Amino acid sequence: MDTEMETEQIYQVDVGNLLAFNPNHRFPSAPSSRGELVKEILTEGTKLVQEIANKLFNFPSTETNDGPIVQLPPPTTKLPREKHIPRPKPPTKWEEFALKKGIQKRKKEKVVWDEQTNQFKRRHGYDRVNDDNDVPIIEAKESDEPGVDPFAKRLDDKKKRVGKQEKNRLQNLKAAEKAGALPSHVQLAATSLPISGTKAQPKKIGKDELGDVAGLAATSTASGGKFDKKLPGEKPPKKQGKHHKYLPVVSGRGDVNAEKEQTNNVLSKIFSKHSHEILNVGKAINMYNVKKEKKKSGRSDKLKPKKDITKKPANKAK
């Protein structure tokens, strides 16, 4: 019991985080080398791990196929955050207006009574209330202009409302980005916002890069942009992909010649590029001149009279 009390006083164990440390540890003397320091750290770390294991075995466990499982208690040590605390977002225009007028947000029901069909329908989504397809008649108003299609005007007004909402959303994101409260998973391409707050602001996209991106987007359809409707003033993409023509798998008439021609074209391109490496012109000229000299010397030897081997050479008078 005394040893357990001593270890509890020496070590502080947080089983919830599987953390143990000794706040009173002191080196008896300064380590003279790195190896001695590592040895001391491993010795002390082994004691701390053993203390955590002793605490775990004191908790009740349940047996499973993978082995005993222990329910850990809640942690007692507060670990520091890796990221800073999220900054509050600036209020949007609607939130400022609602706060000024005292408008409180209330939860709306998902199902609403539709007077056109006399039944309950969803507020949003498929088969919703006040759907444009379910409106057979639109009552005329005194302010309506003659000759204007009310159904087309209804769709046009809806597009304008959606565009205005999108514009307000982008402005809210810009304001949040200026305040440093934009979420890291949101990226606004219109303002070139970075993906993470820790990254530097990206450079402005140049004209060539925009052209490359537009060309990739134009050729990303199933037909490679061939049958797509062109916008007014749209230029053809600069970098158009080339389709590689493969030879047929099943051998037929003329396939051998086509394959031979294709191989010869590849070899001719390789040889033309590296012809200066394959043929040494100076060395070839020297070899040609040497062979020519040898041929000349061989012809002159044939014209000379042959010596009589049987005759002995005459001794010169001393």
Curated annotation (Swiss-Prot):
Keyword rRNA processing appears in the UniProt entry: no
Keywords on record: Nucleus, Ribosome biogenesis
Pfam families: RRS1
GO biological process, one term: ribosome biogenesis
UniProt keyword annotation of Membrane present: no
Protein name: Ribosome biogenesis regulatory protein homolog
Entry's localization field: Nucleus
Organism field: Arabidopsis thaliana (Mouse-ear cress)
Compositionally biased region (Basic and acidic residues): 151-169, 226-237, 298-311
InterPro entries: Ribosom_reg (IPR007023)
Principal localisation: nucleus
Region (Disordered): 59-92, 139-170, 217-259, 289-318
Cellular component terms (Gene Ontology): nucleolus
Function: Involved in ribosome biogenesis.
Family the UniProt entry places it in: Belongs to the RRS1 family.
